Amino acid sequence: MSHGGGGHAAELYPEEQIFAVGIALSLVGCYLANFLSPYGLGMLIGGLLASAACVAGANTVRKVAAYGLGTGVPSIGMVSLGMGTLAAVAGVLIPDYFNLPYLVAPIITLIVSAVIGYIVGRLTVNPVGMKIPIMVRSMTFLSIAGAMALLGFTVAYVGSLEPQKYIDYALNNGMMALAFIAAGMAILHPFNACLGPNESHKRTLTLAVACGFITWFVFSVVKLDIVSIIVSIILWAIVYVKFVKMSFKDACAVLHVPEIPKKEE
């Protein structure tokens, strides 16, 4: 049975597996961005691995939206980043407040995002009353994915997990707002674009990877990291071309729009 109003299309890989891999890669990416930044590799490695959190989040959106959220697909993506923003900021600032090593920030972000996601998930079930059996788990997963995507891309940009640097170069200059929108689109867009009677897990995941790469490209441009700009746009083009070919193959018909007439007939 296909997506788009209920039911589940066949999964290539279990949701838990994709989520675990995506979050693990983004967690490692936060640390590598911190340590490799002095060598000019923070955005190249950190940005690449941060995109994995976007894929994990997009896959969870696909899972929960299959229960019939309808126009709620973009909304739940924004909720993911709303929860993630709180968790990412808390994860960076809590170590400073309690005099803990700042390198524990990604771990604290994971913990805080899981707690926030669980609480929001419980509230959506009661008192809001959304009768989706996987809602609590999905909101927890989305909160974690949103937080790790935000933290991953912003740390890759800042080049450090040190609280004051993060405040100056991720919060005070508005980079967190860019991360909110860019990562949010990367998480909500894949299933929103692919849902329908013939949705396939492979095609949705392919677009999710492309969205992760284009988010990485955006941050590379803002940071003016030439190597990351070139690598990210090449990887995006490769994956996106693959997605377009898959879409043509799966479509029942492909209708090309004719050239607009130069003058009225």
From Swiss-Prot:
Pathway in which the depicted protein is active: One-carbon metabolism; methanogenesis from CO(2); methyl-coenzyme M from 5,10-methylene-5,6,7,8-tetrahydromethanopterin: step 2/2
Keyword Cell membrane set for record: yes
Topology class, membrane: Multi-pass membrane protein
One Pfam family this sequence matches: MtrC
E.C. number: 7.2.1.4
Cellular component aspect of the GO annotation: plasma membrane
Family annotation (InterPro entries): THM_MeTrfase_su_C
GO MF terms held by the record: tetrahydromethanopterin S-methyltransferase activity
Function per UniProt: Part of a complex that catalyzes the formation of methyl-coenzyme M and tetrahydromethanopterin from coenzyme M and methyl-tetrahydromethanopterin. This is an energy-conserving, sodium-ion translocating step.
HAMAP family assigned to the protein according to its UniProt record, in alphabetical order: MtrC
Protein name: Tetrahydromethanopterin S-methyltransferase subunit C
Organism: Methanocaldococcus jannaschii (strain ATCC 43067 / DSM 2661 / JAL-1 / JCM 10045 / NBRC 100440) (Methanococcus jannaschii)
